Amino acid sequence: EQAYRTRKANCLTFTLLTVALAHESGLQAYGQELDDIVAWRVGDDIVYRFNHVNAGIAIGRSRLTVDVAQELVMSRDPPRPISDQQLVALYYNNRAAELLAGASPAAAAPYMAIALQLAPRYASGWANAGVLHLRQGDPRAAERDYLKALALDPANAGALMNLVALYRNNGDEARRAIYARRLEKVQVKDPYFQFLQAEDNARQGAFAGAVQHYRRAIRLYDGDSRFYVGLARAYRQLGEERHAQRAMNRAAALSRRSAGGRN
C-alpha cells in the first residue's frame, strides 16, 4: 500500500505489488529469485546479503518477467520461481538486513523473527540472524546461526565470511583457518567475488591486480559485459589501449546480445 501511494519501491516491494495487482487482474503471477548476484553489503567486517527478486507473469504459453532493476543486477542464471510465502519471507529478511546496516538491531529483530518463521530453511536468513545476534552482543548465538546457515547451504559465502571474522575477533585461530579455507574454495569459483576484488583493486589504483581479477571473473563467466568494461578501464590506466579496445568491443557485443534478449 505504501509503495503504491508513494510511487517508491525496492525490488521486493515492487515485486509484491506487481504480483498482487496481477492476481487482482486474474493473471497467473509469482515471485522469482535470482541467485549468485552482486548484492552484498560489507561494513564493519560483517557481510549482509540482499537478495534480488522480480515478478514472473504467465499469459497463455508466454512467460514474462517484470524487473524494476534489470539494468543494475548482475546474475549468471535465470530467475527461479518461489512461493508467495518465500517472497514475503525475503521481504522481512531484507528489511531486517537494511535496519541492521543502519545500526538498528532492536528494530530489525521482529522482522528477522518473522522471516525465519516463514522460511526456516533459508540459509541466508540464518546468516543475517547471526549478524543480528552479534550486534546484540551475543557472539555464541551468532556462531550458532552461522553454523545453521552452513548446515543448510555449505557454500553460503556470507555465513563463511562472518564466521571467519568472528573467530578472528575472538582469537580462535584454529577454527578461523578451517573456515577461511572453506571460504577460499567458494570464492575462487565465484566470478562476482572476483569482480568485486577487481573493483576494489581499481579503486585503490592497483590496476595490474584489477586486470588479473577481471580476467579471472571472465574465465569463470564470460557473459557479463560489466566485467569487460572494468577490464577496459584498467587496461587504459595501464596504457594498454589495444587490449582496452578489445575488451570494450566484447562488452558492446554482450550488451547488444542482452538488449536483444529483452526485446
Language model segments and positions:
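Hydrophobic/aromatic-rich core segments of domains that either
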Residues: 16-86
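Single-residue signature of alpha-solenoid repeat helices
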Residues: 108, 142, 175-176, 210, ...
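Short coil turns that delineate tetratricopeptide repeat
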Residues: 120, 154, 188-189, 222, ...
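TPR alpha-solenoid repeat register
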Residues: 125, 159, 193, 227, ...
